[in-house]
């Protein structure tokens, strides 16, 4: 029987549908997998190929009851039935008429039911005719927005004249929920159905237009590089459309606001932070600019604005800490104690800016750490070696991609307090290039009048550095003058043998034993062994190589104990030292055993301390040509020319013929030619070497000298006296000649350095010849100084620096 002729029918095969509603006139493919549903289809195919389709209320129920099925369904024709490889069925059905389910029979193999055709009012009034036309137009608008409705469906909708067929076709092509579609299926009055479908279309059009607005806004905010953030930005735009914002955004904004309020910023910084926070609130969290502003605010709140360490004012405690961790260095310790003493009386004072100048290994960096502990300050270190970009100090503008504050602000954040001890390590190793001069940028940091308003390029707000205690370290005075002027220079010259011995015994050896896991009593290194290491295995101003040598002894001793090559305790004697450190690298006492013609020991200052400078001269028949070799700088070459002029002016006193310079060539050589040499302080040594080779009088091998020479033969003062005296002592020199005006410097040099040295101040080159040469021919000037460290007059000169007219001269020191 044709479905159109059925009004009531019993025992109709029932197919329960999940998540789909079939309308009359629809051709729908269905996938069927439940056994009873497949049996019902197979049975219907054998009979009249008709089946009743009804939707489940709860799609998860496997065996539905009549209570779980909607009352209204569709009687359909089975057009095609296919069996799939997995045993399930694919069926193509066409909905024909709406029927009402009256009863449901759950038989053994399938479901059957009693159904009755639904009678509906199909009479259209005038409003209904208008509704049909409006629905067709609005559906066309919907299709234009949706852009997924097939053109065949659009043409079909425009040609439909049956209002029920129109509603069914449109309902099938709208993206609606199951309940909404079922409602449209169940409405009986045609006018009500038309009004309902029109309202549904209008709602869908509004949603599509809102989505288009959201998409348009999102695309405007995005550029090509941010396509990966599209979905997140779209979600944010949806929240904005609803007048809401994400919970994460609210919590982040609140957190930043609280941090700004608690940071204790200055008024200017607070205003900038609040303005930036307002900008951040108006932005999408995923936009690149929002990340820049967020990072900027986090930097502002993370640096210390008001938190301070409580500076210790206990002078005894500070002295104890400094003495415990460092041997000697009395001038530095005294300066720190003076600073603490002033702080005891004055609440607010400018932080001192100290510069520790000395060769490597004398303990500059470790001393800064001890000062921080003694004053109870946080310790931060910034290495300036090789820094050549101004932005390293002041930072980059925050508009640059990946910009950060300069290292000064970064280290202040690390310190966590606004009054740490800030170590500027290797300040003399800074360079400069096209990107700027970092030394000039440091002027603002180290100037007490300016650093209370230090302006980092990234922060762009003033930050107060006036409470910071700056300590710089340097190997030399080769620092820009403007920077040098802002620092208090404290000279750390090299250690004496006795100081090195004490440092090794009290600090280095116990530390190395502990770090290498040796137990107490397993290794003994007597003082005479350490002294031999100092004399024959190291030649340095500091103690770094000494520390490495002791570490090597500890390693080898531990290996012997662990491998049972030796039993503890192991005692390293001077005789067994080569077993642990190999053959001695240096010969203690560099002075020659015999006096030599034309060979003089000069004294030089280097960045790593003092050193002996060997000078050789030889003369040969020629035409008066003077040659200098040994990688000499321009200043030293000029010194050789001045020295030759001095010799020529004193040819009579030296017993030389007037035309000696026309018949002899003189060659000056400075051994270790791979090392560059420069400076004026070798003037008197060069003069002595030339005088010796021309007169054939040997130079005393136990004499070393330093001093600049003038054309009149006057000896001018030099710098680095302590380092040079230490070098003389290390080289086994007994007698040292120094410029007369350097006598005043002896007062600041410890007696330990001066012990064992016979120091002679000299004013004129004739005095040098008198002492350095074995003999002095034709001496006409008896006013040669015979002052030495053994004379009582030396004590008077040192005690009363202004006692003679010569010492009152203010000649500048020269290196």
From Swiss-Prot:
Q: Name one Pfam family in it.
A: Lon_lid
Q: Name the job this protein performs.
A: ATP-dependent serine protease that mediates the selective degradation of mutant and abnormal proteins as well as certain short-lived regulatory proteins. Required for cellular homeostasis and for survival from DNA damage and developmental changes induced by stress. Degrades polypeptides processively to yield small peptide fragments that are 5 to 10 amino acids long. Binds to DNA in a double-stranded, site-specific manner.
Q: Reaction catalysed? A: Hydrolysis of proteins in presence of ATP
User: Where does the record place the Lon proteolytic domain?
Assistant: 594-775
Q: What protein does this entry describe?
A: Lon protease 1
Q: What is its EC number?
A: 3.4.21.53
Organism encoding this protein? Hydrogenovibrio crunogenus (strain DSM 25203 / XCL-2) (Thiomicrospira crunogena)
Taxonomic lineage is:
Bacteria, Pseudomonadati, Pseudomonadota, Gammaproteobacteria, Thiotrichales
Instruction: Write out the entry's keywords from A to Z.
Output: ATP-binding, Cytoplasm, Hydrolase, Nucleotide-binding, Protease, Serine protease, Stress response
Gene Ontology cellular component? cytoplasm
Q: Where are the transmembrane segments?
A: none
Gene3D superfamilies according to UniProt: 1.10.8.60, 1.20.5.5270, 1.20.58.1480, 3.30.230.10, LON domain-like, P-loop containing nucleotide triphosphate hydrolases
Q: Which family does it belong to?
A: Belongs to the peptidase S16 family.
Fill in the subunit field for this protein: Homohexamer. Organized in a ring with a central cavity.
Q: Which GO terms describe its molecular function?
A: ATP binding; ATP hydrolysis activity; ATP-dependent peptidase activity; sequence-specific DNA binding; serine-type endopeptidase activity
* The keyword Nucleus appears for this protein: no
Q: Its induction, per UniProt?
A: By heat shock.
User: Where on this chain does ATP bind?
Assistant: 358-365
Cytoplasm as a keyword of this entry, yes or no, is yes
